[in-house]
Amino acid sequence: ESTDGWNNAGTGHAGYCELNYTPETAEGVEIDRALSINANFEISLQLWSSLVKTGELPAPNQFINPTPHISFVWGEKNVAFLRERYSKLSQHHLFKEMEYSEDFAVLNQWMPLVMTGRDTSVPVAATRISHGSDVDFGSLTRNLIASLESNEQFNLMVSHEVTDIERAKDKRWDVRLKNLETGKSIVISAANVFLGAGGGALPLLQKSGIPESKGYGGFPVSGQWLVCQNDEAVKRHHAKVYGKAALGAPPMSVPHLDTRIINGKPALLFGPFAGFTTKFLKKGSRLDLIKSIRPNNLVQMMDVG
């Protein structure tokens, strides 16, 4: 579900504009996580480039498009934070092309829709990396699967739900699948099982029973997003603009105004508007949260609350 184009912001988590990757500590702004995340994104770019060359992925503009990444803040304290963040990140070769400005006129050129009607007496600042990207992970995933389907050893099973994962005596994994159309179940033996980081991962991790699953909990804070496909508005904004979340607020609360190119059509994604749901997936059960509570994750759940 998370790979669908509209179910993520499409930054690729490059670390250019996501301010929660550079937390402010007693020693100042910490940049190590942003550097690590960006290095991983560069590896993803290299992989995709290689797959394009071998014909396993289509032309890059079918799933990734150049889009500037901008971090924007207001207020003296936040401006000081962004100034320090820029000072530290721009010294690293991965971020050497980052631009910084506190000039209202410059920011108006970078993101006119964001600056329109804003109080010019309030201190503002922004950083921009022009070589950022908008990634349509839905298109990327569909094309990767289409390529994998040419391999006889690959089998994609849709309309199936994993209902249990057990360690077998031979140290392999017995994975029980339920066909949601017929109701029938089968068991597949696998040497390795990989769980993605989507909404359905926690219940599967808990079913595996591995020691590392203990202590994890899910608190499904939701964000409602709106989409603008008005051509005139879309033409006036070409960037991914990220704000700064309030102290203690989850990353989901970071305000966005994102250029999106989904299935080749430009649009604007903006939000979030706070919400709450006990579902872990869009089409999940309202009991997902309750069913995930264990004695070993009660402390973590209470800390979130």
Please provide the spans of the model-predicted regions.
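Glycine-rich FAD pyrophosphate-binding loop
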Residues: 1-5
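Dinucleotide-binding Rossmann-like beta1-alpha1 core, especially the glycine-rich loop
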Residues: 10-109, 267, 279, 285-288
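Flavin (FAD/FMN) cofactor-binding and adjacent substrate-gating region
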Residues: 58-67, 71-146, 150-151, 155-157, ...
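Generic beta-structure capping elements
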Residues: 15-17, 178-180, 273
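Short, solvent-exposed loop/turn segments at secondary-structure junctions
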Residues: 17, 77-79, 163, 200-201, ...
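Predominantly flavin-linked oxidoreductase catalytic cores and closely associated redox partners
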Residues: 130-234
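Active-site substrate-recognition segment that forms the wall
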Residues: 10-13, 63, 187-305
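Short, well-ordered beta-strand micro-motif
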Residues: 13, 71-73, 128, 176, ...
